[in-house]
């Protein structure tokens, strides 16, 4: 747009001739703003000033203001902008809404529609009035929708926050008392006593015990922590009473009308190699004693024997000291027990242990003195020795039958069986076959063809194919029932010992097995039992990373890295438990023993890889090698140790731990001497000595004592007599001693010579 020269001249002339004339200014056509001129003092100047200010809104540099006189379509958008701008000032999300509104503003660059400034201003005023009268419905609705959509999540957030606050402000209060059964980790202890882990760790740190939340502490430390926070700890006797009240090993008989007599369960106990298996071989007409590795029983073995048309179930238990848990379990499962004592060996520690188990369980028992074919004269002596264990024979006026037997000749074997049936009749053993089956797992293993399998002693009820069962953390739908003759049967009556298939995992030995109504119920109960760790898991946890009050005071910083890590594969759960029991007896103040994994099953390539990765020793016990495991071991240079006898395994682990011990020496005195004079030779101090006892040897260890305090300990480097080097000096002779690292000899120093003899390292 160009400036009109004619108009410009007319305007300038009017300014120059008459400043008060405003009419000529009105005659101007299409005035254009060039720059602002402020004139003072006259009314005409004021009018001109107002016109020029008005022209500010009409020039090409103010297109946004000119848009107010645009067509009605544009005015609608502007009216919404003005109204929405007022509404959004009071909204929390006004910035977001303002941005949306501004994005919808359209600027029209066509200036040809503006021809007259007067008409433009009038039209603009009218348009503004109309726009202000109309409510901005579309914009307000969109705003309401935005606000409405945010209300529900906000309410949910508030509800979640309030629930979190309640959970934080309402913690579980610490219990008044707790019962201790097994060692716990710091995290588990925190959950048990409802005390934060940090508080427990802080308390132990102040006691000089540094732990983490995953480390296991023994019952003494747990008791100390509980008492510090005002929580009582139940004694072992109280725990035993609670166990007896909830003992599921005892069959529950509901309806006496359905009860029938059941066969007695007889457990044979005694010291190792006293003839337990030989007795069962004679009764069962088998030869298992000669088939056993090492000549010892390492598992609980069950037999069903028929005598005089009556059934008797025998359980043969291991006699080795490592199988204490098995013997204890056998004593608790049995109706009648037989204690075997060899006539040529007498009463042994495992014999006394078996008697104590039976007396605690209040189980009637018979004493059978075996091997009388070798030594019959010792029978009376054994009877009198048993009195010290509160076992009084019928011959001496007591109630315990004592029967001399021979498994070689069969002498008095029938008398022993008759006595068993007589005791069973007196005990009135009964069960209800109409109930759901209930029993105890005697043994469990992983079968390579059938999966997890278990040997079950049925105490009450009848077990059927297809029954749903829960065994601790394991659930099962019984696929097969195998009797003692290795035959598949459809059902098993009370006092039967059968093998069952169809388990979800290998259960722990000693677990209670219960038949339930549905598969869903079995799975739910198995999940509930997961909160209480299985017997094996508890024993493994108590063995690994143990921290006790005794070890805290004896362990050194340099011993913390001395650790033997084991991966063990066994033949069954009974062996697993026995191995853990034996390993837990090892002292761990000098070397820590860590069982990384222990399970029944074959040694696999995965086990080999795990052993290689963790630098662990891979040990097998009476188990086989899976395909590919030997090749993996050769490739990864992993040595696999496979044992057949449990005490060989235990000694092998002990040797591994002892090899990590620092060498220990004992001092053996050799001789004594006394310093008579000190002289220098080539800037070296020489001690002139007289040997007062035995002799001195070159390169032997010596102690230099001054006023009964050791001032030096080391080796003799040079030993001279007059000017000659000698290897030894006998008592009564004089000699010169030189030690390069000790030059502070004084007259009157005592010298004690000794040898360091390596001691046998022990844990």
Swiss-Prot record:
Keywords: Chloroplast, GTP-binding, Initiation factor, Nucleotide-binding, Plastid, Protein biosynthesis
InterPro entries documented for this protein: EF-G-like_DII, IF2_II, IF2_N, P-loop_NTPase, Small_GTP-bd, T_Tr_GTP-bd_dom, TF_IF2_bacterial-like, TIF_IF2
Annotated source species: Porphyra purpurea (Red seaweed)
Domain tr-type G per the UniProt entry, residue ranges: 261-429
Highest taxon in the source lineage: Eukaryota
Family matches, as PANTHER family: TR-TYPE G DOMAIN-CONTAINING PROTEIN (PTHR43381:SF5), TRANSLATION INITIATION FACTOR IF-2-RELATED (PTHR43381)
Compositionally biased spans, kind Basic and acidic residues: 73-92
Polar residues: compositionally biased ranges: 151-168
Protein name, entry field: Translation initiation factor IF-2, chloroplastic
Record lineage: Eukaryota, Rhodophyta, Bangiophyceae, Bangiales, Bangiaceae
Stored CDD domains: IF2_eIF5B, IF2_mtIF2_II, mtIF2_IVc
Family: Belongs to the TRAFAC class translation factor GTPase superfamily. Classic translation factor GTPase family. IF-2 subfamily.
Plastid is among the record's keywords: yes
Basic residues bias spans: 93-104
UniProt-annotated stretches for the region Disordered: 1-22, 52-122, 149-168
């Amino acid at each position: 747009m160009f400036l009109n020269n004619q108009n410009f001249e007319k305007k300038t002339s009017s300014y120059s001739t008459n400043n008060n004339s405003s009419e000529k200014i009105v005659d101007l056509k299409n005035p254009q703003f060039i720059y602002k001129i402020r004139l003072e003092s006259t009314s005409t100047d004021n009018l001109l000033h107002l016109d020029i200010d008005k022209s500010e809104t009409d020039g090409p540099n103010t297109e946004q203001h000119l848009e107010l006189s645009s067509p009605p379509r544009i005015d609608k958008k502007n009216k919404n902008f003005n109204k929405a701008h007022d509404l959004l000032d009071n909204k929390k999300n006004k910035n977001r809404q303002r941005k949306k509104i501004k994005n919808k503003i359209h600027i029209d660059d066509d200036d040809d529609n503006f021809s007259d400034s007067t008409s433009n201003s009038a039209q603009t005023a009218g348009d503004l009035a109309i726009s202000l009268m109309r409510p901005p419905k579309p914009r307000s609705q969109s705003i309401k929708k935005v606000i409405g959509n945010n209300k529900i999540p906000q309410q949910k957030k508030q509800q979640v926050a309030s629930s979190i606050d309640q959970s934080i402000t309402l913690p579980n209060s610490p219990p008044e008392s707790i019962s201790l059964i097994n060692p716990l980790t710091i995290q588990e202890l925190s959950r048990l006593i409802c005390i934060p882990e940090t508080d427990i760790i802080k308390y132990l740190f102040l006691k000089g015990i540094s732990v983490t939340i995953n480390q296991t502490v023994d019952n003494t430390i747990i008791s100390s922590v509980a008492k510090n926070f005002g929580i009582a700890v139940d004694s072992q006797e109280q725990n035993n009473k609670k166990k007896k009240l909830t003992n599921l090993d005892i069959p529950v008989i509901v309806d006496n009308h359905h009860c029938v007599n059941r066969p007695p369960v007889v457990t044979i106990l005694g010291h190792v190699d006293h003839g337990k298996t030989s007795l069962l071989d004679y009764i069962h007409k088998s030869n298992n004693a000669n088939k056993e590795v090492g000549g010892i029983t390492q598992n609980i073995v069950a037999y069903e024997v028929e005598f005089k048309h009556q059934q008797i179930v025998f359980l043969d238990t291991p006699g080795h000291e490592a199988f204490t848990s098995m013997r204890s379990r056998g004593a608790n499962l049995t109706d009648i027990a037989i204690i075997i004592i060899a006539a040529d060996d007498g009463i042994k520690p495992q014999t006394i242990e078996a008697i104590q188990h039976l007396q605690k369980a209040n189980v009637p028992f018979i004493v059978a003195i075996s091997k009388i074919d070798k030594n019959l004269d010792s029978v009376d002596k054994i009877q009198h020795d048993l009195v010290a264990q509160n076992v009084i024979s019928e011959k001496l006026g007591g109630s315990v039958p004592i029967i001399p037997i021979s498994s070689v000749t069969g002498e008095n074997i029938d008398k022993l069986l008759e006595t068993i049936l007589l005791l069973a009749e007196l005990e009135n053993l009964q069960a209800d076959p109409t109930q759901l089956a209930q029993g105890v797992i005697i043994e469990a293993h992983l079968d390579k063809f059938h999966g997890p399998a278990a040997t079950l002693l049925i105490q009450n009820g009848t077990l059927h194919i297809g029954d749903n069962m829960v065994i601790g953390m394991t659930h099962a739908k019984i696929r097969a029932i195998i009797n003692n003759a290795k035959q598949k049967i459809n059902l098993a009556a009370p006092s039967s010992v059968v093998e069952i298939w169809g388990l979800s995992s290998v259960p722990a030995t000693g677990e209670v097995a219960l038949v339930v109504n549905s598969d869903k119920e079995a799975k739910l109960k198995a999940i509930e039992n997961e909160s209480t760790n299985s017997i094996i898991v508890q024993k493994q946890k108590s063995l690994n990373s143990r921290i006790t009050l005794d070890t805290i005071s004896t362990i050194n910083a340099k011993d913390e890295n001395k650790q033997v890590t084991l991966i063990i594969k066994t033949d069954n759960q009974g062996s697993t438990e026995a191995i853990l029991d034996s390993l837990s007896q090892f002292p761990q103040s000098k070397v820590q023993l860590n069982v990384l994994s222990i399970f029944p099953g074959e040694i696999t390539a995965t086990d080999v890889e795990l052993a290689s990765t963790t630098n662990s020793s891979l040990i097998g016990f009476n188990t086989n090698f899976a395909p590919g495991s030997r090749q993996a071991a050769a490739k990864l240079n992993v040595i696999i140790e496979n044992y057949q006898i449990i005490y060989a395994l235990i000694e092998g682990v002990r040797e591994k731990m002892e090899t990590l011990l620092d060498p220990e020496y004992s001092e053996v005195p050799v001789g004594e001497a006394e310093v008579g004079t000190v002289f220098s030779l080539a800037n070296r101090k020489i001690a002139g000595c007289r040997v007062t006892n035995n002799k001195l040897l070159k390169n032997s260890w010596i102690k230099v004592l001054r006023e009964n305090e050791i001032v030096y300990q080391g080796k003799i480097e040079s030993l001279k007599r007059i000017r000659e080097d000698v290897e030894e000096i006998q008592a009564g002779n004089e000699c010169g001693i030189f030690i390069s690292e000790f030059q502070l000899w004084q007259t009157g120093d005592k010298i004690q010579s000794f040898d360091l003899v390596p001691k046998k390292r022990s844990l």
